[in-house]
């Protein structure tokens, strides 16, 4: 199959297994959920009545004081006491096989091609790290909400895009399922397409 280059009167020959496969919604959903879960920190901790610092001594005798009976100062109803159902650190990570992950990326890339959301160009960059220059270039291409994928991070391009809310720059190694579906369009260079094919086999 061929992908038409937007900035040249030519087309790029690509593998149908990477850019022309059927969309597997269940697989993409599973991988995206796992990716988001793996990004969770999960670090939270509260202490139960067994873990708070304090004496184990009964605060006052059972009868005769006129006060409500109490057996510990570490109970949940006491100020400084433990929490009834204390939250603990959790590991939210989900395992995703390499084959599944690559399959999800192929599914997403193929769907981007079908929906005409994948824009392939011969090359892309800016001469200076100027946001204004990049904005004008994207406007000429009628792109606003876009992920730019290059073989390696170009510093000028990265700095120019840093202040644009709906623009992100990634190298091929930095793409992931969430970033690919988060933007309206994905702008990718011809060299990056070849690298993606090599990476996904």
From Swiss-Prot:
Membrane spanning stretches: none
- GO biological process entries: translation
UniProt-listed InterPro entries: Ribosomal_uL4 (IPR002136), Ribosomal_uL4-like (IPR013005), Ribosomal_uL4_dom_sf (IPR023574)
One GO cellular component assignment for this chain's record is: ribonucleoprotein complex
Q: Which family does the record assign?
A: Belongs to the universal ribosomal protein uL4 family.
Assembly information from the UniProt record:
Part of the 50S ribosomal subunit.
Name the chain's protein: Large ribosomal subunit protein uL4
Task: Report the source organism.
Answer: Shewanella loihica (strain ATCC BAA-1088 / PV-4)
């Amino acid at each position: 199959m061929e992908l038409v280059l937007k900035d040249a009167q030519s087309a790029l020959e690509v593998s149908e297994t990477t850019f022309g496969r059927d969309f597997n919604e269940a697989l993409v959903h599973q991988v995206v959920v796992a990716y988001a879960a793996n990004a969770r920190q999960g670090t939270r901790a509260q202490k139960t009545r067994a873990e708070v610092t304090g004496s184990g001594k009964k605060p006052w005798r059972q009868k005769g004081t006129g006060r409500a009976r109490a057996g510990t100062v570490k109970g949940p109803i006491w100020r400084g006491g433990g929490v009834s159902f204390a939250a603990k650190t959790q590991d939210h990570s989900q395992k995703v096989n390499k084959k599944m992950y690559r399959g999800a990326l192929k599914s997403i890339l193929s769907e981007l091609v079908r929906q005409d959301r994948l824009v392939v160009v011969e090359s892309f960059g800016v001469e200076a790290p100027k946001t204004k220059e990049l904005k004008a270039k994207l406007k000429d291409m009628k792109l606003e909400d876009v992920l730019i994928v290059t073989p390696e991070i170009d510093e000028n391009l990265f700095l120019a895009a840093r202040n644009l809310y709906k623009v992100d720059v990634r190298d091929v190694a930095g793409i992931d399922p969430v970033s690919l579906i988060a933007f309206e369009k994905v702008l990718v260079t011809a060299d990056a397409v070849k690298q993606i094919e090599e990476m996904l086999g």
